Swiss-Prot record:
Protein known as: 3-isopropylmalate dehydratase large subunit
Reaction equations catalysed: (2R,3S)-3-isopropylmalate = (2S)-2-isopropylmalate
Taxonomic source organism: Burkholderia pseudomallei (strain K96243)
PANTHER family linked: 3-ISOPROPYLMALATE DEHYDRATASE (PTHR43822:SF9), HOMOACONITASE, MITOCHONDRIAL-RELATED (PTHR43822)
Binding site for [4Fe-4S] cluster: C347, C410, C413
Length: 469
């Protein structure tokens, strides 16, 4: 019987299935960070349990680390406690960890693939919503809660119910100026933030196959914003080439065997999906969110929608509340929206290709950050990304134009560290969530691609980067 990619990943990891369909799944890799792991380790200590498979875990601090000068340490006592606690727990249990001043440190969903710890055919979990990122490698990856983090540490398994299969098929050539971020925002705009609820989404079609691994990671990263349990892309030569030579991958004869195995992780011809959604890539234009949910998105050449035209009273009410919070008037051209701050970073868009795309726009415009922009910051996703960008001179492109070049971390994606918006500030952000208060109490977030964020920094408002050529 023909199987989907998700079916293959699920079936190859089932240890036992209960009568109600609940399955015990074997977990190949757990990624840990400082926010959702302390209680899990404390539970192990209280129960006097060991970590079942130490080598299956990889840890890093990312949410609370400062992105400015780290020689002064972490100022906030709660943040410092969380980072110190992860350090102590990893030392006590012998878990591999990249500490704050290690060049390999970075955002957990960037360092996993970067190190080759994320591999095709794996089940991967982390106490973090955007674990779906790793599905780009033909893996089953999703976020879990703190009690589940403890369960995986203790047993290397997890109780789960199988999701339904959804295929999101994007065909055709992506227009100039459009990126993976625009693809996934367009998908969410089409199906909504509940469209993927109860599903695992496979992203397929010629447009997805043409993406680099970094682009695929951006798409899978935001599968959770469409309500899906997981997002994934079939393994192909692009996947294998990306992994070749990375620290955690097999070598020699084991590499050849692994590649042969990995390439089986694709949907069979004739495999049946419970839902299929199709998009024409040629119709996608640069996207900008206008509201307080990723589904509240439109094209750069569009306008802020008018709630009066929405027939559904629930949706109309949500639109009205969002516009009030965002301080936007209906029918305002998106290009007329001015911004106060720019954030280029996060597990969605802080890889080297993202940094290059933003730098290209800054060089093309050849001007400094607009006077009305109070802060424009670029936060690389890892120390290795930062070092690569600096070798290419990209840091100078940004700093000479008035941007701040920071140390790696989650930064302004969420208001959990020193990088945040003040009440009423408006930010063009390359992150994944634009909820109320996500980047700081009263902060207003617009999700865009790195190129769009860079252009907004220079112009002081959103602009259509397709005009840049």
């Amino acid at each position: 019987m023909a199987q989907t990619l998700y079916d293959k990943l699920w079936n190859s990891h089932v240890v036992h299935t209960e009568e109600d369909g609940t399955a015990l799944l074997y977990i190949d890799r757990q990624l840990l960070h400082e926010v959702t792991s302390p209680q899990a380790f404390e539970g192990l200590k209280l129960a006097q349990r060991p970590v079942w498979r130490i080598s299956a875990n990889l840890a890093v601090s990312d949410h609370n680390v400062p992105t400015t000068d780290r020689s002064h340490g972490i100022a906030d006592p709660v943040s410092k406690l969380q980072v110190d606690t992860l350090d102590a727990n990893c030392d006590a249990y012998g878990i591999t960890q990249f500490k704050m001043n290690d060049v390999r440190q970075g955002i957990v969903h960037i360092i996993g693939p970067e190190q080759g710890a994320t591999l095709p055919g794996m089940t991967i979990v982390c106490g973090d919503s955007h674990t779906s990122t790793h599905g780009a490698f033909g893996a089953l990856a999703h976020g879990i809660g703190t009690s589940e983090v403890e369960h995986v540490l203790a047993t290397q398994t997890l109780l789960q119910k199988k999701s339904k299969n959804m295929l999101v098929k994007v065909e055709g050539q992506l227009p100039r100026g459009c990126t993976a971020k625009d693809i996934v925002l367009a998908i969410i705009g089409r199906i909504g933030t509940a469209g993927g609820t109860g599903y695992a989404i496979e992203f397929g079609g010629s447009t997805i196959r043409a993406l680099t691994m970094e682009g695929r990671m951006t798409v899978c990263n935001m599968a959770i914003e469409a309500g899906a349990r997981a997002g994934m892309v079939a393994v192909d030569d692009t996947t294998v080439e990306y992994l070749k030579g990375r620290p955690f991958v097999p070598t020699g004869a084991e590499w050849d065997q692994a590649v042969e195995y990995w390439k089986t992780f694709r949907s069979d011809e004739g495999a049946q999906f419970d839902r299929v959604v199709e998009l024409d890539a040629a119709q996608i234009v640069p996207q900008v969110t206008w509201g307080t949910s990723p589904e509240m998105v439109t094209s750069i050449d569009g306008r802020v929608p008018d709630p009066e035209r929405e027939k559904d009273p629930v949706k109309r009410d949500a639109m009205e509340r969002a516009l009030a919070y965002m301080a936007l008037a209906p029918n305002t051209p998106i290009e007329a929206i001015k911004v106060d701050k720019i954030f280029i970073g996060s597990c969605t868009n802080a890889r080297i290709e993202d940094i290059r795309a933003a730098a290209y726009v800054v060089k093309k415009l050849n001007r400094r950050v607009a006077p009305n922009v109070r802060l424009a910051m670029v936060v690389p996703g890892s120390g290795l990304v930062k070092a690569q960008a600096e070798r290419e001179g990209l840091d100078k492109v940004f700093t000479e134009a008035g941007f701040e070049w920071r140390e790696p971390g989650c930064s302004m994606c969420l208001a959990m560290n020193a990088d945040r918006l003040e009440p009423g500030e408006r930010c063009a952000s390359t992150s994944n969530r634009n909820f109320e208060g996500r980047q700081g109490q009263g902060g207003r977030t617009h999700l865009v691609s790195p190129a769009m964020a860079a252009a907004a920094a220079i112009e002081g408002h959103f602009v259509d980067i397709r005009r840049l050529g």
